[in-house]
């Protein structure tokens, strides 16, 4: 058990480092999205980090199952480190995968990607359907749908998020929309439209993006 506990502790340390790195690249992506300058590379890097976290978490789960009650403290640590990561992963995917019906396929392909290919951002970008044919394509700018940004708006249902992101299709279009533009969408209305406009402006201000990006 001591050797197993030692391996589990090392894996949790790795998870901690991965989580910190994910926070950094996710924050960078958020800033770039609000400045309308996110690239395929930025998105692929975030997905790469998320997949690495999923893999190390899966490994730790196996250790914890073997450790039983002796792994309880580690289990709490892991829970704390990965809190919200699954929903964040789903939101990033829905922002950049063209067809939401492809999410399950993308998940499966990322999971089956060999450990030697998880470092290949081109492979990850192509799994996401972002059409990378050469390394230079990784630096192509790409627009999110705004799903993740909308998820931060209080009192907004998932149905409303889907309806709004389907209506405007990109975050820049959504940020340029007025309350009148948004309130006509099904399941939104005036109050929620106002919340969306105010919250998106606040998000942009929080990352220093201003209302019109750069």
Where are these regions (language model features)?
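Charged heptad-repeat coiled-coil "stalk" segments of single-pass membrane proteins
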Residues: 41-47
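Phosphate-binding and adjacent anionic-ligand microenvironments
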Residues: 54
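General structural signal for secondary-structure boundaries
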Residues: 2-3, 39, 120, 178
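Short, exposed interaction patches on small structured surface elements
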Residues: 1-19
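Long, highly charged, low-complexity intrinsically disordered interaction regions
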Residues: 16-17, 21-30, 47-50, 58-185, ...
């Amino acid at each position: 058990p001591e050797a197993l506990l030692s391996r589990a502790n090392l894996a949790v340390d790795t998870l901690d480092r991965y989580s910190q790195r994910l926070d950094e690249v996710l924050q960078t992506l958020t800033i770039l999205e609000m400045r309308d300058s996110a690239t395929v590379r930025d998105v692929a890097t975030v997905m790469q980090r998320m997949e690495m976290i999923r893999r190390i978490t899966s490994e730790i789960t196996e250790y914890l199952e073997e450790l039983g009650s002796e792994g309880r403290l580690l289990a709490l640590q892991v829970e704390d480190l990965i809190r919200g990561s699954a929903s964040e992963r789903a939101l990033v995917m829905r922002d950049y995968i063209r067809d939401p019906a492809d999410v399950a396929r993308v998940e499966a392909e990322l999971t089956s990607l060999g450990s030697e290919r998880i470092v290949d951002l081109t492979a990850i970008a192509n799994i996401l359907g972002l059409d990378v044919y050469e390394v230079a394509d990784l630096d192509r700018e790409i627009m999110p749908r705004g799903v993740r940004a909308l998820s931060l708006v209080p009192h907004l249902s998932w149905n409303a998020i889907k309806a709004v992101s389907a209506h405007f299709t990109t975050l820049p279009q959504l940020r340029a929309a007025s309350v009148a533009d948004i309130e006509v969408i099904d399941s939104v209305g005036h109050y929620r439209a106002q919340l969306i406009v105010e919250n998106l402006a606040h998000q942009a201000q929080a990352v220093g993006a201003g209302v019109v990006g750069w």
